Every structure is written in structure tokens, then in C-alpha cells.
């Protein structure tokens, strides 16, 4: 039985539930619900966890409860507990440097300034894990200044218009993840990176 570990990044709690920074949580909750699997809190993994099978693959889903900037502690706990090879891990994360609705699947790379990815890299001492980045668009400029209002943007709630776009994105990503056992990874990477929600 093959095992796939999907880790969505976000912040726990109602205050942050529908924020742009919680894209990873929202996508994995949608996937878990599709397979009638509930998330259960596991303190030793510092995460809420869900598990189900698709054909001969076991999908294990995790929502860290460490808050975004400490995501690496949860990922480290998951890797240590399950003795996971890093190539089995997929991190689902928001990206303010991508236009809303764009997807980027990479097998490895730097944090790109994302604190959740930075924490994971620090804890794993490696950049060699897969990540699916979902664009939330650039933050607006602060009126009268040359600075971007990044914190308000990433922690702000997803609007109805954004949700309509992200629903299409989530559907595309979920369909690709479901075919990890039938399609070559290169094909899935090309599918996601060329996705256009229009």
C-alpha cells in the first residue's frame, strides 16, 4: 500500500478559518469531506488528521495546530512518527506572489518568503519536499506609502468573488491528487502549472 502525506498550512481557530493564509486547510478539508473522512486531533503529531484510501493508495491528511510560523514542528513530528520519506510529502500552501487562481507545483525549492515553508525547511533541514502553491494575489499598497499591506491581506477573509475562483482551483488540485496513482508526476505537474481558471 502506497502512502501519501498531504499537509495543508494555515492557522487554527475560528478567527482565521476563512483567511487567505488558510488555503491549505480549506483545500484538505474539502478533499477529506469528499471521502467522508473526519479530522481528529492527534497531539503527538501537533495536527488534526484524516485518512482514507483511493485504490491502492493511503492518503493521510494533516492540518497543523502550531500556527503558520511554527508549521515545521508539526511536519517534523509527522515525519518522525511515520518514518516518512520526504518524497511522500506534499505541502499545500497559499502564495501572495502568484496571481489569484494560479497554481505552482514544485518538487523542491526555497521558502519564497513564506514563513510556513521557512519553518518546515528549518525543521527538516531540507528543501527537498513537494509543495503546491496556490495564488491569492498581491496585497494592496498602503495608502500614501510604498509598503504593501501584507499581513492584512493574508489574514483577511476570502471574498465571495475569490471563493468562486478558488473553488475551481481546489477542484483541479483535488482531481490531480486523486490521480497520483494513475498518472506520472511530471504529467500532474504540467497539468497544475498550466491550469487557467478562466
Swiss-Prot record:
The active site is at 21 (proton acceptor). SUPFAM superfamilies: Peptidyl-tRNA hydrolase-like. It catalyses: an N-acyl-L-alpha-aminoacyl-tRNA + H2O = an N-acyl-L-amino acid + a tRNA + H(+). GO terms for cellular component: cytoplasm. The keyword tRNA-binding applies. Its EC number is 3.1.1.29. It comes from the Bacteria. This is Peptidyl-tRNA hydrolase. The record marks 94 as: Stabilizes the basic form of H active site to accept a proton. One of its GO terms (biological process) is rescue of stalled ribosome. The record marks 11 as: Discriminates between blocked and unblocked aminoacyl-tRNA. The lineage of its organism: Bacteria, Bacillati, Cyanobacteriota, Cyanophyceae, Synechococcales. PROSITE patterns: PEPT_TRNA_HYDROL_2. It comes from Prochlorococcus marinus (strain MIT 9301). Belongs to the PTH family.
Amino acid at each position: 500500500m502506497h502512502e501519501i502525506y498531504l499537509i495543508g498550512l494555515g492557522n487554527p481557530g475560528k478567527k482565521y478559518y476563512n483567511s487567505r493564509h488558510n488555503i491549505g486547510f480549506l483545500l484538505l478539508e474539502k478533499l477529506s469531506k469528499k471521502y467522508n473522512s473526519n479530522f481528529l486531533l492527534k497531539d503527538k503529531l501537533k495536527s488534526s488528521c484524516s485518512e482514507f484510501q483511493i485504490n491502492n493508495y493511503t492518503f493521510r491528511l494533516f492540518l497543523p495546530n502550531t500556527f503558520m510560523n511554527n508549521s515545521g514542528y508539526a511536519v517534523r513530528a509527522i515525519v518522525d512518527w511515520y518514518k516518512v520519506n520526504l518524497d511522500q510529502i506534499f505541502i499545500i500552501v497559499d502564495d501572495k506572489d502568484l496571481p489569484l487562481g494560479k497554481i505552482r507545483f514544485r518538487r523542491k525549492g526555497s521558502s519564497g518568503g513564506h514563513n510556513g515553508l521557512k519553518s518546515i525547511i528549518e525543521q527538516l533541514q531540507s528543501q527537498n519536499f513537494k509543495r503546491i502553491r496556490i495564488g491569492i494575489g498581491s496585497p494592496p499598497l498602503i495608502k500614501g506609502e510604498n509598503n504593501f499591506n501584507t499581513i492584512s491581506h493574508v489574514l483577511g477573509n476570502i471574498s465571495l468573488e475569490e471563493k468562486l475562483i478558488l473553488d475551481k482551483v481546489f477542484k483541479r488540485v483535488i482531481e490531480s491528487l486523486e490521480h497520483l496513482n494513475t498518472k506520472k508526476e511530471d504529467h500532474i505537474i504540467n497539468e497544475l502549472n498550466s491550469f487557467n481558471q478562466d
